[in-house]
From Swiss-Prot:
Residues 276-310 are cytoplasmic. InterPro entries: Neurexin-like (IPR003585), Syndecan (IPR001050), Syndecan/Neurexin_dom (IPR027789), Syndecan_CS (IPR030479). GO terms for biological process: canonical Wnt signaling pathway; cell migration; myoblast development; positive regulation of exosomal secretion; positive regulation of extracellular exosome assembly; receptor-mediated endocytosis; striated muscle cell development. Residues 1-22 form the signal peptide. Belongs to the syndecan proteoglycan family. Keywords: Glycoprotein, Heparan sulfate, Membrane, Phosphoprotein, Proteoglycan, Secreted, Signal, Transmembrane, Transmembrane helix. Shedding is enhanced by a number of factors such as heparanase, thrombin or EGF. Also by stress and wound healing. PMA-mediated shedding is inhibited by TIMP3. Its main location: membrane. The modification Phosphoserine is found at S285. Interacts with CDCP1. Interacts (via C-terminus) with TIAM1 (via PDZ domain). Interacts with MDK. Residues 117-127, 153-164 have a biased composition (Basic and acidic residues). This is Syndecan-1.
Length: 310
């Protein structure tokens, strides 16, 4: 359990301090089987480390200034931890890249603490500690070869090494490369071969300008055509809408006129019927009264009263 806790602690340090502590990353990687499977590729990277070291020794002064600037800007991004002081002390070593042998010496100094703890826990881990030390020796060369391959090819204008280093490096190295690439363009512009570097940005800038001009021209052309289409389309739509509106209005007017005429006719008929009814009623009143008088004549008292005397 204690050993697993130590492995987890080392992995956490590796993830939190990737750009600042490549040595700790190297010590954390060998226990994992991934670096063990890549020992063969580490040998190739170790063979190429010598050539990279010769190139970097020829240009130590610009690389140290740029590395110190990058390292001072990068440690601020990770979370504040108690090991930042050690990160600052160890970050100066990869800046020069000359004291890589000293870095290899620092690794065994850190490991003996772990080996001592393991020896206190169990006597057998001595054999297991010897095996990781051999792997660490190989992985240190691998990491030192990968780091310059990722950082310096940008400064020395060697794209070949950069292409081989980016896929070969693990996920942690890939996370570390963006910081170096961010500072890479400034380093290449200030490094040697200013003519090549000036041609590249000039071509890129001209291409970008061409793209921007083309897009702006297309946009202006589209904008110039769209207003015409928009101006023409409303006229067509207005004409069609006006014709449709007139047709609709004619129909509406026809319907209104027909309705008005029907209403007038109905009103006239109603008024005539009412007048006829009134007249009929007047005439009917006399006709009705006459039969009443005839019927009532039998019952009516005689107008002439004849008095009969007995």
């Amino acid at each position: 359990m204690r050993r697993a806790a130590l492995w987890l602690w080392l992995c956490a340090l590796a993830l939190s301090l990737q750009p600042a502590l490549p040595q700790i990353v190297a010590t954390n990687l060998p226990p994992e089987d991934q670096d063990g499977s890549g020992d063969d590729s580490d040998n190739f990277s170790g063979s190429g480390a010598g050539a990279l070291q010769d190139i970097t020794l020829s240009q130590q002064t610009p690389s140290t200034w740029k590395d110190t600037q990058l390292l001072t800007a990068i440690p601020t991004s990770p979370e504040p931890t108690g090991l930042e002081a050690t990160a600052a002390s160890t970050s100066t070593l990869p800046a020069g890249e000359g004291p890589k042998e000293g870095e290899a010496v620092v690794l065994p100094e850190v490991e003996p603490g772990l080996t001592a703890r393991e020896q206190e826990a169990t006597p057998r881990p001595r054999e297991t500690t010897q095996l990781p030390t051999t792997h660490l020796a190989s992985t240190t060369t691998a990491t030192t070869a990968q780091e310059p391959a990722t950082s310096h090819p940008h400064r020395d204008m060697q794209p070949g090494h950069h292409e081989t280093s980016t896929p070969a490096g693990p996920s942690q190295a890939d996370l570390h490369t963006p910081h170096t690439e961010d500072g890479g363009p400034s380093a290449t512009e200030r490094a040697a071969e200013d003519g090549a570097s000036s041609q590249l940005p000039a071509a890129e800038g001209s291409g970008e300008q061409d793209f921007t001009f083309e897009t702006s021209g297309e946009n202006t052309a589209v904008v110039a055509v769209e207003p015409d289409r928009r101006n023409q389309s409303p006229v067509d739509q207005g004409a069609t809408g006006a014709s449709q509106g007139l047709l609709d209005r004619k129909e509406v007017l026809g319907g209104v006129i027909a309705g008005g005429l029907v209403g007038l006719i109905f009103a006239v008929c109603l008024v005539g019927f009412m007048l006829y009814r009134m007249k009929k009623k007047d005439e009917g009143s006399y006709s009705l009264e006459e039969p009443k008088q005839a019927n009532g004549g039998a019952y009516q008292k005689p107008t002439k009263q004849e008095e009969f005397y007995a």
